[in-house]
Amino acid sequence: MRKIVIAGNWKMFKTQAETQEFLQGFLPHLEETPQGREVILCPPFTDLSVLSKTLHGSLIQLGAQNIHWEEFGAYTGEISGPMLTESGVRFVIVGHSERRQYFGETDATVNLRLRTAQRFGLTPILCVGETKQQRDAGETESLIALQLDKGLVDIDQNNLVIAYEPIWAIGTGETCEAVEANRIIGLIRSQLSNPNVSIQYGGSVKPNNIDEIMAQPEIDGVLVGGASLEPESFARIVNFHLV
């Protein structure tokens, strides 16, 4: 059965003090959250230990924004699976467009990170999506098919979340129409061997469009950027209303 998965990606925002302030405003709203919704926070690495202690026993699961494919070694600036699990992490974002764009992530390295996440008992959130140029050229479907084909080699689809993030809609304020996002996510699902993989939409998700997004039959959740940084905003998204 497909789960509703709502993840907040904090990117490079929030100090430990700001994280504690966020939680004070956000946690009370979880009393209103319907059962069966997986809520994940993916903070910077420096906030993981603080969140792990504070969130213990709560509805929120802890996620990370990256994982290296080696268990240990001379990889300056990276973090390993054992380090994440020791910090209480259960989910990890892999292949986000910003990692691909700014840090040279490829489908091959994405696959290595996915395998490693699963090897250490983590559930990876695989991000796929197209740029505006690729979309305008009519390459969306073929590009995503290629990302899935290369990224999912030897990956257990029983322990996987996928996020469709049209790159042209990330941080731009421009949102993919909900019906179009639903169509693309349906195409993604058709390429999977497991029809019960939860597939999220990510790209300028906000309180004023969450209900329409989650009304789409193929969409199982959202990967939220900027709107996850404010307690009231993220709470409204987590507690979306089905229409």
From Swiss-Prot:
Pfam families associated with the record: TIM
NCBIfam families noted in UniProt: tim
Catalytic reaction list: D-glyceraldehyde 3-phosphate = dihydroxyacetone phosphate
Keyword annotations of the record: Cytoplasm, Gluconeogenesis, Glycolysis, Isomerase
GO molecular function, a single term: triose-phosphate isomerase activity
Subunit structure: Homodimer.
Protein's cellular compartments: Cytoplasm
BP GO terms, sorted: gluconeogenesis; glyceraldehyde-3-phosphate biosynthetic process; glycerol catabolic process; glycolytic process
Pathway this chain belongs to: Carbohydrate biosynthesis; gluconeogenesis; Carbohydrate degradation; glycolysis; D-glyceraldehyde 3-phosphate from glycerone phosphate: step 1/1
Annotated function: Involved in the gluconeogenesis. Catalyzes stereospecifically the conversion of dihydroxyacetone phosphate (DHAP) to D-glyceraldehyde-3-phosphate (G3P).
Family: Belongs to the triosephosphate isomerase family.
Name of protein: Triosephosphate isomerase
Positions annotated as active site in the UniProt record: H96 (electrophile), E165 (proton acceptor)
Main location, first listed in the record: cytoplasm
Any single Gene Ontology cellular-component annotation: cytosol
PANTHER family reported for this sequence: TRIOSEPHOSPHATE ISOMERASE
Gene: tpiA
Listed EC numbers: 5.3.1.1
Positions contributing to substrate binding: N9, W10, K11, G171, S204, G225, G226
